[in-house]
Amino acid sequence: MRRLSGILVIYIISTVLFGHFTNVARARYHYHKGRHGVTHPLPPPPPPPLETANPPDQVPSDPYPSPDPAPGDSDSGCVFDVTSFGAVGDGSCDDTAAFQDAWKAACAVESGVVLAPEGGVFKITSTIFSGPCKPGLVFQLDGVLMPPDGPEEWPEKDNKNQWLVFYRLDGFTFSGKGTVEGNGQKWWDLPCKPHRGPDGSSSSGPCASPTMIRFFMSNNIEVKGLRIQNSPQFHMKFDGCQGVLINEIQISSPKLSPNTDGIHLGNTRSVGIYNSVVSNGDDCISIGTGCSDVDIQGVTCGPSHGISIGSLGVHNSQACVSNITVRNTVIRDSDNGLRVKTWQGGTGSVSNLLFENIQMENVLNCIIVDQYYCQSKDCRNETSAVKVFDVEYRNIKGTYDVRSPPIHFACSDTVACTNITMSEVELLPEEGELVDDPFCWNAYGKQETLTIPPIDCLLDGSPVVEEAYDSNYGC
């Protein structure tokens, strides 16, 4: 009886232990499968997430008829290699039709990918890639994409003001490890382009030259990983967009290439520009009217004309810009650093600007507000102006080009700049020991800490006419 009881106890203990180890083993090998088709782009450290854009109009279910499958398509039904649609990729043949056909095919399916593969040099003429498209569309550029070489090769029927246009898209990504080559040299050499003389002066005459990449009336756009270079004019432009993320791109053109702004924003909201390098012949980043909630971090800028807000208020127009942040950025060998420029006679406002943790290296006009911006010698004096207020400069350090004072606040005679805050600003001459005095005109603000050079020219308090301005010019 005792032997039987012992056997029964051993059996019960063995059963319990076996069940326990089985559950442990199952727990070790249990996993959660990710959702199919969901991508997780690397978050740009350290910026906060962008604000959620307002939902756009509903996208039609099938904007393009499905084309017949092209021979040699990828095993994935969602990847449309342009070479399968007839692209040659030798840098000489016109591959425009192949890109248009691949776009139509990818646009018609969810998570479609237009692929320009590595090793190809694809030449296409001025093209509008339009939507609406199915969700998740990607243009993957791993080769080289370029326009015709100069104005003489540009087709007569094509628009000379733009080359690649992305229009009416939502949830679109332009990415890859490839290069967008602008072939800009012959455009820069046109006699109507501004050219800088040996004395530093320039003569200008407007003439049509294409912006290389333009996003127009689109939402939730991402551009990442690309190299964009030698644009005839602006490298990348966003007009009427909302929800833009630009991450880990390189933009480059020669220092004296005219009008080659790196990234230009106009009437665009909720923008993040992160971890990128821009060197060019004009503004690194320019922010025009109608822009708000722009976050710029981790950018290396220069040689260039710096980071600019404006020009604003031209031809007596109203301009509204607000909530712009520039942090953790380097500006080097540039004609300007952090600039706000407005024309006389405009209305509206520029407000809530934060410039923080900026390193300057041999920069002319490190900090500048210019409310007398003019591109000729005959601009007349006017009483109205775009109001500039609530501007913070924090931890701005480095060296400046001694040809101009490092701090310059030239505010309107009638519409003062107000609530300017300076904290931990230390700017020393790149050459020599003489520190230039800042310039202030009708600028109100405060120093939270001592600055180098000392900025004793800021006025205390607020101007008497402030209330009258707010009732007439507010955005």
UniProtKB/Swiss-Prot annotation:
Gene3D superfamilies linked to this entry: Single-stranded right-handed beta-helix, Pectin lyase-like (2.160.20.10)
GO biological process: carbohydrate metabolic process; plant-type cell wall modification involved in multidimensional cell growth
PbH1 repeats: 241-267, 268-289, 291-311, 321-342, 350-371
SMART domains named in the record: PbH1
GO molecular-function terms, A-Z: polygalacturonase activity
Signal peptide range in chain numbering: 1-27
InterPro entries per record: Glyco_hydro_28, PbH1, Pectin_lyas_fold, Pectin_lyase_fold/virulence
Keywords: Cell wall, Cell wall biogenesis/degradation, Glycosidase, Hydrolase, Repeat, Secreted, Signal
Compositional bias ranges of the Pro residues kind: 41-50
Catalytic residues in the record: D282 (proton donor), H305
Family: Belongs to the glycosyl hydrolase 28 family.
Protein name: Polygalacturonase At1g48100
